[in-house]
C-alpha cells in the first residue's frame, strides 16, 4: 500500500496529549501524521535534547508512504513534554505514559519502533500490554543489564552523562563523535540545533541528573522476562555501537521467541539515521509481511 505524501514537517504534525500516571498529570508532546489503519509509534533515546522528531525525521515519510499512521512521542523529561524527576524505572514510566497517550487518542493496537531508551520503553509496554502490540523494532536498546563486550557504563554513556551535567558545544561534539560511526555526517547546523534543543529545556537536563542520583539504574533488566514477549520482533544494531554493546542485542534475540537481528557494519548507536534508506526498506518490509 502506498499513500501520497505531502511535505511532513515538525510544526505541521505537532500536538499535545494530557495523560495521568497515578496522581501525576503529564502534558505529552507528539508528532502525529498519516492516516493509515495501522499505527507505528516511535520512541526516542535518552540523549540530551532528544525528541521524537530529532531521532526519527529521516524515517517518517517512508512509513506514511507505505500507508501507516506515524506517532512520535516525546517522553516525559524530553522535548516539549512535561518535566519529571524519576526515581523508579524510566522504562516502565515511559511504557505507562505511552499507554495513556494511546488511550487518549483511542488507538488500540500499535507497532513500536524504539531506539535506545525507546527500545527499553517498548519492551516495558509490550510486557505490560501484550494484546496492544503488533510488531516491535528495537534499535540499540531493549533491556538494561550487563555486557560481556564492554565495561558498564560504556564510553558513550559516560559522555552522555557528562553532557547532561555540563551542556556545551564542546561536550556535545565529544559525545556525538562516538554516537555515530562517521562523524563527518554531523553538520554544524545539526550540532547547533541539538544544543539549542538542550539549552531550551534546562529543567530537563537538571532533572535527568537528579533522577540518576535517585536511581542510578533507570533502565530495567528484562532478561528474565523476554520470553513473555509474543510480538514478532526485529532487533537492529550497529556493529560499532559505543553506547549499548552489541551483545545486548544478542541477549534480546536469545530471549524473545519470535525475534530476528540485523547488524549494520560501519554503524554506531543511531542506525535509523546513519543507514536511513536501508533501515526504512527493512522496517517497511518487516511490518508489511
Curated annotation (Swiss-Prot):
GO terms for molecular function: 2-hydroxy-6-oxonona-2,4,7-trienedioate hydrolase activity; 2-hydroxy-6-oxonona-2,4-dienedioate hydrolase activity; protein homodimerization activity. One of its GO terms (cellular component) is cytoplasm. It is an enzyme of class 3 (hydrolase). Disulfide bonds: none annotated. SUPFAM superfamilies: alpha/beta-Hydrolases. InterPro entries: AB_hydrolase_1 (IPR000073), AB_hydrolase_fold (IPR029058), Epox_hydrolase-like (IPR000639), MhpC_alpha/beta_hydrolase (IPR023791). It comes from the Bacteria. Pathway: Aromatic compound metabolism; 3-phenylpropanoate degradation. GO terms for biological process: 3-phenylpropionate catabolic process. The record marks 116 as: Transition state stabilizer. It catalyses: (2Z,4E)-2-hydroxy-6-oxonona-2,4-dienedioate + H2O = (2Z)-2-hydroxypenta-2,4-dienoate + succinate + H(+); (2Z,4E,7E)-2-hydroxy-6-oxonona-2,4,7-trienedioate + H2O = (2Z)-2-hydroxypenta-2,4-dienoate + fumarate + H(+). The active site is at residue 269. Its EC number is 3.7.1.14. Homodimer. Belongs to the AB hydrolase superfamily. MhpC family. Catalyzes the cleavage of the C5-C6 bond of 2-hydroxy-6-oxononadienedioate and 2-hydroxy-6-oxononatrienedioate, a dienol ring fission product of the bacterial meta-cleavage pathway for degradation of phenylpropionic acid. HAMAP family: MhpC (MF_01654). This is 2-hydroxy-6-oxononadienedioate/2-hydroxy-6-oxononatrienedioate hydrolase. It comes from Cupriavidus pinatubonensis (strain JMP 134 / LMG 1197).
Amino acid at each position: 500500500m502506498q499513500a501520497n505524501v505531502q511535505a511532513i514537517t515538525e510544526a505541521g504534525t505537532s500536538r499535545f496529549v494530557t495523560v495521568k500516571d497515578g496522581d501525576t498529570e503529564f502534558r505529552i508532546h507528539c508528532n502525529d501524521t498519516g492516516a493509515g489503519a495501522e499505527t507505528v509509534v516511535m520512541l526516542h533515546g535518552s540523549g540530551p535534547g532528544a525528541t521524537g522528531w530529532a531521532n526519527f525525521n529521516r524515517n517518517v515519510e517512508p512509513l506514511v508512504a507505505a500507508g501507516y499512521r506515524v506517532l512520535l512521542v516525546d517522553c516525559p523529561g524530553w522535548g516539549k513534554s512535561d518535566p519529571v524527576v524519576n526515581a523508579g524505572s524510566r522504562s516502565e514510566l515511559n511504557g505507562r505514559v505511552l499507554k495513556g497517550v494511546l488511550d487518549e487518542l483511542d488507538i488500540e493496537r500499535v507497532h513500536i519502533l524504539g531506539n535506545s531508551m525507546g527500545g527499553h520503553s517498548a519492551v516495558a509496554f509490550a510486557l505490560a500490554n501484550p494484546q496492544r502490540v503488533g510488531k516491535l523494532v528495537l534499535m540499540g536498546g531493549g533491556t538494561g543489564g550487563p555486557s560481556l563486550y564492554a565495561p558498564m557504563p560504556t564510553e558513550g554513556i559516560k559522555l552522555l552523562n557528562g553532557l547532561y551535567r555540563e551542556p556545551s558545544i564542546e561536550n556535545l561534539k565529544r559525545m556525538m563523535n562516538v554516537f555515530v560511526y562517521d562523524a563527518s555526517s554531523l553538520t554544524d547546523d545539526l550540532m547547533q540545533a541539538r544544543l539549542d534543543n538542550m539549552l531550551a529545556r534546562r529543567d530537563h537536563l537538571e532533572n535527568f541528573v537528579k533522577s540518576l542520583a535517585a536511581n542510578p539504574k533507570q533502565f530495567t533488566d528484562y532478561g528474565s522476562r523476554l520470553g513473555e514477549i509474543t510480538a514478532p520482533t526485529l532487533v537492529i544494531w550497529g556493529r560499532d555501537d559505543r553506547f549499548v554493546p552489541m551483545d545486548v542485542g544478542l541477549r534480546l534475540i536469545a530471549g524473545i521467541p519470535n525475534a530476528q537481528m540485523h547488524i549494520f557494519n560501519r554503524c554506531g548507536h543511531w542506525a535509523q539515521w546513519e543507514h536511513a534508506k536501508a533501515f526504512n526498506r527493512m522496517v517497511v518490509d518487516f511490518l508489511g509481511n
